[in-house]
Regions:
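Glycine-rich active-site loops that engage anionic ligands at enzyme catalytic sites
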Residues: 1-212
């Protein structure tokens, strides 16, 4: 964290720390969690939010502890060395917005798939709904906004794009992302110690498949 990072207080027990990238957010969040001083630490895309015990810590002490934690030299942020390949069946009933995206962007089905699949991406964060993955690195030629009217229910495994990212639904739920496909990759396992397959910092690659 650099001296210029903005720190803001929200309410009596929340602090937000602005960062310059998702990678910096995850690194800072890991450092803060390691101290054991905080109730919860969440790394996002451009900020880290931490919750503290307002009875044990006043705001000045919290800010001082944050600076102490981050004053050491920052190591190089390394991405996960492994790439998780995620099979995606594009279009048809699996991607209800696929044809509309092709028409909007003046792309053939093959061109859209080629722009989305076969490239390495990085999971920026999980959020919105449990296990939902915000994945950075989307080709700028696939720039589309979110839906004006979000869907009440989206099938688990759905692959959406919007606002420069790919969104991956680990669980069914509402959502306004533009759906172009679906994966059969096991994104959620309730019996596992870590129930969600993806986490921030992981590298993924979408692979086009004809059927789920």
């Amino acid at each position: 964290m650099s001296p210029g990072n903005k720190i803001q207080a929200f309410g009596d027990d929340l602090i937000s720390i602005d960062v310059s990238s998702p990678a910096e957010a995850q690194l800072l969040a890991e450092r803060l969690r390691a101290t054991g001083d905080w109730i919860e630490v969440v790394g996002g895309i451009d900020a880290v939010v931490l919750q503290f015990d307002a009875v044990l810590h006043d705001l000045d002490l919290v800010i001082r502890k944050i600076h102490e934690t981050t004053s050491q030299d920052e190591p190089v942020v390394a991405m996960s060395p492994d790439v998780v390949e995620i099979p995606v069946c594009y279009g048809r009933e699996f991607g209800p917005d696929f044809d509309a995206v092709c028409a909007m962007l003046k792309l053939s089905a093959e061109e859209l798939i080629a722009l989305h699949a076969g490239h390495d991406y990085t999971v920026d964060m999980l959020g919105f709904t449990p296990g939902f993955a915000y994945i950075g690195g989307l080709d700028e030629r696939l720039g589309v906004p979110r839906l004006r009217e979000p869907r009440v229910s989206v099938v688990a495994g759905s692959v959406g794009i919007a606002d420069g990212r790919t969104g991956l639904y680990a669980l069914p739920g509402p959502g306004g992302w533009v759906l172009i496909g679906r994966t059969s990759y096991p994104l959620f396992d309730a019996t596992a110690d870590q129930p969600f397959a993806l986490k921030a910092g992981m590298r993924v690659r979408f692979v086009a498949v004809p059927e789920l």
